[in-house]
Each structure stands twice: as structure tokens, then as C-alpha cells.
């Protein structure tokens, strides 16, 4: 007999002798941490799972843009990230960058996956990050809820 409970952001499953605890991580924080990783390492990034994780979340989960903005600022500040407009523009130009396309193809092959396509991943990042990044560099509060069904903010 297994009983499960949800406590705040923790979920535990109990049977007679074992307690397994799963800590849930807010999707906004996962997106922010992966995004900062991408901005830090740029094309020198070796593990492209950051891109895949962001893509998967943006395709399936509704997100609070304000929380994403706050998390990017918090994580970026801790890692001493430079918050300049050009930084995001450079990453978004990787959509047509042959080197990054090849890296993505190699990553998918290693992971034994055939999709998503690099251009599709980058198109979704282009839809999500520019308005959040603009608010960050202008020191504004971003208000917007990401709707995965529409692939845009409301």
C-alpha cells in the first residue's frame, strides 16, 4: 500500500518501510538557470541539454514571465553575468550558425533522439526571451504569462 502526499513544493511517497522524497523545482527557475548557462558559455557550451530543457518547458508549461525575469536577474547576478542587449542577440543568431547546428545534431545523436530541430528550438527561444531580456536591461518589471499552446506571452 503506497500513500502519496503533496506538501508545498515537496512530494513524498510512503510505503511501510521507505520514504522517497521528490523536490519540485519551479519551471521558471529551471528556465532561468539554463538560460544563464547559455549566456555564460555562448558557443563554447558543451552540454546542449540546456537548450533542450528550455525547449521542453516552453512547449508544455505555462510560465510567469515576471518570475523568470526575477530568477534570471538573481542567478545572473550570482554568476556575475553581463546583462547587455548584444549578449541575447548573439545567442539568437545561433539559429543560422552552422557550428551550433552541427553541435545540436551531434547532441541529439548522443542522446539517441531525432528531434527537435535546431531551428525549431531557436525559434521558440526567439519568441520567449527578447521581451523578458528587454525588461531586464531596461530595469523594468516584466508582466506576461507564457502560453505554450500559443507559443507567446499574454
Predicted regions: what they are:
Residues 10, 14-23:
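Short, cationic low-complexity segments
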Residues 33-37, 52-58, 123-133:
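Short, hydrophobic/amphipathic alpha-helical patches that form generic packing surfaces
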Residues 42-44, 59-67, 132-138:
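Short helix-capping/linker segments at secondary-structure and domain boundaries
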Residues 89-154:
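Long, low-complexity C-terminal extensions of enzymes
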Residues 1-8, 12-13:
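Single conserved hydrophobic/aromatic residue that forms the stacking wall/gate
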Residues 51-98:
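Small-residue-rich helix-loop
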Residues 23-48, 52:
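Phosphate/pyrophosphate- and phosphate-bearing ligand-binding catalytic cores of soluble enzymes
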Residues 19-20, 38-41, 87-92, 112-113:
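A ubiquitous short alpha-helical element
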Amino acid at each position: 500500500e503506497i500513500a502519496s502526499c503533496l506538501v508545498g513544493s515537496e512530494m513524498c511517497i510512503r510505503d511501510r518501510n521507505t520514504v522517497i522524497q521528490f523536490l519540485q523545482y519551479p519551471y521558471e527557475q529551471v528556465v532561468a538557470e539554463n538560460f544563464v548557462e547559455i549566456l555564460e558559455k555562448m558557443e563554447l557550451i558543451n552540454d546542449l541539454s540546456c537548450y533542450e530543457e528550455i525547449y521542453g518547458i516552453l512547449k508544455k508549461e505555462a510560465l510567469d514571465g515576471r518570475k523568470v525575469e526575477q530568477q534570471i536577474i538573481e542567478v545572473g547576478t550570482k554568476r556575475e553575468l553581463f546583462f547587455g542587449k548584444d549578449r541575447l542577440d548573439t545567442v539568437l543568431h545561433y539559429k543560422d550558425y552552422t557550428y551550433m547546428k552541427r553541435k545540436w545534431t551531434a547532441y541529439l545523436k548522443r542522446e539517441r533522439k531525432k528531434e527537435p530541430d535546431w531551428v525549431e528550438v531557436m525559434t521558440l527561444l526567439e519568441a520567449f526571451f527578447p521581451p523578458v531580456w528587454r525588461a531586464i536591461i531596461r530595469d523594468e518589471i516584466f508582466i506576461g504569462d507564457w502560453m505554450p499552446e500559443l507559443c507567446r506571452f499574454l
